[in-house]
Swiss-Prot record:
InterPro entries: Na/Ala_symport (IPR001463). It comes from the Bacteria. Gene3D superfamilies: Amino acid/polyamine transporter I. Coiled coil: none annotated. It is found in: Cell membrane. This is Uncharacterized transporter YflA. Its main location: membrane. The keyword Transport applies. It is a multi-pass membrane protein. The chain crosses the membrane at residues 15-35, 66-86, 89-109, 147-167, 179-199, 210-230, 237-257, 303-323, 353-373, 386-406, 410-430. GO terms for molecular function: amino acid:sodium symporter activity. Belongs to the alanine or glycine:cation symporter (AGCS) (TC 2.A.25) family. The gene is yflA. Disulfide bonds: none annotated.
Amino acid sequence: MERLLVWIEHISDWLWGPPLIILLTGTGLYFTILLKGFQFRYPLYIFKQTIGSVGKKPKGEGTVTPLQALTSALSSTIGAANIVGVPAAIMFGGPGAVFWMWLIALFAMAIKFSESVLAVHYREKNEQGEYVGGPMYYITKGLRMKWLGVFFSVALIVELIPSIMVQGNSVSVSLAETFSFNKIYAGIGIAFLIGLVVIGGVKRIGKVTEFVVPLMAGAYAGAGLLIVLMNLSSVPAFFSLVFSNAFTSSSAVGGFAGAALAETVRWGFARGLYSNEAGMGTAPIAHAAAMTDHPVRQGFWSVIGIVIDTLIICTTTAFIVLASGVWTGKNASNDPAALTTAAFQHYFGSGGGYFVSVSLVFFVVSTIMVVIFYGVKQAEFLFGRLAGHVIKFVYLAAIIIGAAGGAKAIWGVLDLALVFIVVPNVIALLLLSRKVKALYTEFFTSEQYYLKDIRKTKQKPVYPTKEAKNS
């Protein structure tokens, strides 16, 4: 069994190296070109239609508000990858990995935008009156390939079990180390609290994440901003360190062993993609339930999600780790996951360590909450509502098993399982790219949407190119 797990881990490491990085990066570039670089052409408009519309009555039909859909999607992306994944990228790829993480985030916006657009376009209303959608629906309805939609759903249901076990292990260990709780009891308590939320369905999850996500993300980014203000003189040095190491091999410094340019690019791309989940098909499940008058309008919210997750939260972690100097510590490479805690302790003493532990708990708990919802929707798609109720308890049990230590042997299994949801989803995105472009063109050339919004604010419109209009 041990040899099998080692074999699986080697395969996972290889797949999450060049193969998937090339696939996802290529897809991001393709959609960026296809949609004429919309994320660069309409940044202010996108911001006004998302963050700028908070507090206004949503347009169109849906189950949850656009903000609740975003916070639900962010709950599954803002987590351990932001706190422990970024230091790992720095230790194994060097400071320059941060640049490549930023770069891939810009192209990943086009992937997540396209996922959400298709999810809303092909969504359905279930027996309870809730809007449901995601890859399983746009694969089945858009491509008329139900077998592939079923494959995606089954793969996601299976993948979420080790994912939840790993997350359950992370939060229980954090509570045990910080507050001396028993790990198993901590797992049971977390499972109970999460159960109270997920049993209430998408509306309750939306209400909880709408409160928790802005609070926890704001607190973490706020702490990072405070450190920036305490170290304003270090800001130019931070950017210099990142850019000077982005295009050359990084030399060894202290506990940092150095990194070849290829490793710098690989770690930056991999951590960026892993953090924002572009191409994985999970976030569109949340966005499909949003109240909106057009799929493209909800797609803008997924773009903002990457801004918050990668460009703000991950950058906050990167600055703190690099500015504090902990990445050059004697034994830094032995445990990159501990660098964020060490960096906060560098500035705030023991209180900084408690802050990171509490942040990690909130991040992980909200992640588990939402991924259980994703699994429930897959079970309902395959077998109906009763199966959705059953799978909730399977996932809640996985939290407790993970808390007991059962997750340690399946990290490789988790990464391998992710491949089986990424590949069919990306294939579907590419095959449905003409539909994405048609919806994009419709939104930006119709008098009902973009042109109407621009006239209200008396802004000069930015029209799609002739090629887009004629598509």
